[in-house]
Structure formats: structure tokens, C-alpha cells
Amino acid sequence: MGIFAEAETWVAVAFVILMALFAYLGVHRTVLQALDNRRARIKAELDEARKLKDEAAKLLADYRARRAQAEREAEAIISSAKADAERIAAESKAKLEDFVARRTKTAESKIALAEAQAVADVRAAAAEAAVSAAATILSQSVKGQVADDLLGKGIQEVRSKLN
């Protein structure tokens, strides 16, 4: 029996014939083209993924920059509001102190005026009482024209000294 009786020989012959048939039909070109197409598709997907990653990184950087800017603006607004509030409080305090000082001065003026008026009223009442008492005493003790002249002169003198 020889070499042609062995199963391995026929497997090898079938393999060689199959490979020759594949070569004749151009199967290797179809397989290579399919592999090239797959490689190109994978490369395109990787390029697209890299492009998307770069865009995402730019968007993230832009977001962070905007957020930092917004935080700086918020801090500026807050510090400005605090400064305005402090300024308004200081102005209000100064206005209140000025108002209280003016009211105090006005009240003191009114009190001094009322006090002066009261003193003048008391002096006038005392002068009237003294004049009336002097007139009564003089009219009872001195009679006639001399009494009237003395009485008039005395009343005028008392009034001028007491007022």
C-alpha cells in the first residue's frame, strides 16, 4: 500500500487543492479587503473618539473658565454689596446722630426760651405785686398832690428796675 493509502496524504492533497482553488478564485484578496475595511473603520472610529475627547476637553476647560469667572463676579458683587451696606449704615448713623443733635439743640433752645419767659413772667408778676403793694401803702400813708406825684414816680422807677 503506499503513500496513497494514508489518510494524511489525502488530507494534504485536499488542502493543497483547496488552497489552489482559493488562490484561483481570489479569496485571499476578498479576505484582505475585508480586513483592510475593518482596519479603516476601526481607525475612523478611533479618530472620531479622539476628536470627541478633544472637544470634551475643550468644553470642560471652557466650563471651568466660565465657572471661575462667574465665581469672581459673584465675589465682586458680594463685596460691592457689603461695601454699599457698610456705607449706607455709616451714612444712616451720621444722619441719625445729626438729627438727634439738632433735636437736642432745638429742645434745649425751647427749654431756655421757656425758662427765660418764666423768669420774665415771675419778675413781671413780682413787679406788679410790688407796685400794687407800694401803691396801696403809699396811698394810705401819704395824701394829696405830693402823694400822687410820689406814687407815679415810684411806680415808674420800680417798673424800670424790675423789668
From Swiss-Prot:
<dbReference type="GO" id="GO:0046961">
    <property type="term" value="F:proton-transporting ATPase activity, rotational mechanism"/>
</dbReference>
<dbReference type="InterPro" id="IPR050059">
    <property type="entry name" value="ATP_synthase_B_chain"/>
</dbReference>
<dbReference type="InterPro" id="IPR002146">
    <property type="entry name" value="ATP_synth_b/b'su_bac/chlpt"/>
</dbReference>
<comment type="similarity">
    <text>Belongs to the ATPase B chain family.</text>
</comment>
<dbReference type="GO" id="GO:0046933">
    <property type="term" value="F:proton-transporting ATP synthase activity, rotational mechanism"/>
</dbReference>
<keyword id="KW-0472">Membrane</keyword>
<comment type="subunit">
    <text>F-type ATPases have 2 components, F(1) - the catalytic core - and F(0) - the membrane proton channel. F(1) has five subunits: alpha(3), beta(3), gamma(1), delta(1), epsilon(1). F(0) has three main subunits: a(1), b(2) and c(10-14). The alpha and beta chains form an alternating ring which encloses part of the gamma chain. F(1) is attached to F(0) by a central stalk formed by the gamma and epsilon chains, while a peripheral stalk is formed by the delta and b chains.</text>
</comment>
<keyword id="KW-0812">Transmembrane</keyword>
<keyword id="KW-0813">Transport</keyword>
<keyword id="KW-1003">Cell membrane</keyword>
<protein>
    <recommendedName>
        <fullName>ATP synthase subunit b 1</fullName>
    </recommendedName>
</protein>
<comment type="function">
    <text>Component of the F(0) channel, it forms part of the peripheral stalk, linking F(1) to F(0).</text>
</comment>
<keyword id="KW-0066">ATP synthesis</keyword>
<dbReference type="GO" id="GO:0045259">
    <property type="term" value="C:proton-transporting ATP synthase complex"/>
</dbReference>
<dbReference type="Pfam" id="PF00430">
    <property type="entry name" value="ATP-synt_B"/>
</dbReference>
<dbReference type="GO" id="GO:0005886">
    <property type="term" value="C:plasma membrane"/>
</dbReference>
<comment type="function">
    <text>F(1)F(0) ATP synthase produces ATP from ADP in the presence of a proton or sodium gradient. F-type ATPases consist of two structural domains, F(1) containing the extramembraneous catalytic core and F(0) containing the membrane proton channel, linked together by a central stalk and a peripheral stalk. During catalysis, ATP synthesis in the catalytic domain of F(1) is coupled via a rotary mechanism of the central stalk subunits to proton translocation.</text>
</comment>
<keyword id="KW-0138">CF(0)</keyword>
<keyword id="KW-0375">Hydrogen ion transport</keyword>
<keyword id="KW-1133">Transmembrane helix</keyword>
<keyword id="KW-0997">Cell inner membrane</keyword>
<feature type="transmembrane region" description="Helical">
    <location>
        <begin position="7"/>
        <end position="27"/>
    </location>
</feature>
<keyword id="KW-0406">Ion transport</keyword>
